[in-house]
A protein has these predicted regions:
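Generic structural signal for well-ordered alpha-helices
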Residues: 3, 27, 64-67, 71, ...
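Glycine-rich anion/phosphate-binding loops
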Residues: 19-22, 61-62, 84-100, 129-130
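Hydrophobic faces of well-ordered beta-strands that scaffold small-molecule active sites
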Residues: 17-20, 38-40, 78-82, 107-109
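N-terminal amphipathic alpha-helix/helix-capping segment at the start of soluble metabolic enzymes
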Residues: 1-20, 29
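Glycine-rich, proline-tolerant flexible connector loops at the mouths of alpha/beta enzymes
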Residues: 39-61, 86-88, 109-127
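Active-site mouth loops of central-metabolism enzymes
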Residues: 11-24, 57, 80-90, 148
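Conserved, mostly hydrophobic/aromatic
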Residues: 23, 30, 81, 103, ...
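Conserved small/polar residues in nucleotide/adenosyl-binding loops
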Residues: 142-147
Length: 159
């Protein structure tokens, strides 16, 4: 499914189940099970590559490499967790660009401070609204409408 058709699919306004995957094999299994989309979380990469909790230890490169290996093998869209964008607004823009090149259909960016913590862990901090707006604006300035339209979403860490 191409990104434009994923956008059309999301516009249908019904639930899209996107199971969490952590490598190309788990992605293939999920695709063969019939799922329409997949979700690559920062936690899954931290657990499987580092054997650690999701506390901001993974790098942009580790996530982009894992994403590229997955999208090389599956045809369904992959939503990827960009954590906090791996830095400031310019880093976040670079992250979105890199993830788009690696085949992401959608990128999720959190509004946490550093060090970030997995959503279910205590001790999270939220960045100032202006800082998060700067990150989102940087992403939107990069993601102009195109045949490879990349959607960007935000998950509030306070939820």
């Amino acid at each position: 499914m191409t990104n434009p058709s994923f956008k059309t699919r999301l516009a249908r306004n019904d639930i899209v189940l996107a199971p969490g995957v952590y490598d190309a094999l788990s992605a293939l299994v999920a695709e063969q099970a019939g799922f329409e989309a997949l979700y690559l979380s920062g936690a899954s990469i931290a657990y499987t590559r580092l054997g650690r909790s999701d506390v901001g230890l993974t790098t942009f490169t580790e996530v982009a490499d894992t994403l590229a290996r997955i999208t090389e093998r599956v045809r369904v869209p992959v939503i990827v967790d960009a954590d906090t964008g791996f830095g400031n607004a310019l880093n976040t823009q670079r992250t979105v660009r890199g993830f788009e090149r690696a085949g992401a259909a959608m990128v999720q960016i959190e509004d946490q401070g550093f060090p970030k913590r997995c959503g279910h862990l205590d001790g999270k901090t939220v960045v100032p609204v202006g800082e998060m707006c700067g990150k989102l604006k940087a992403c939107l300035l990069y993601t102009s409408p195109s045949p490879r339209d990349l959607s960007t979403s935000r998950m509030p860490s306070s939820a």
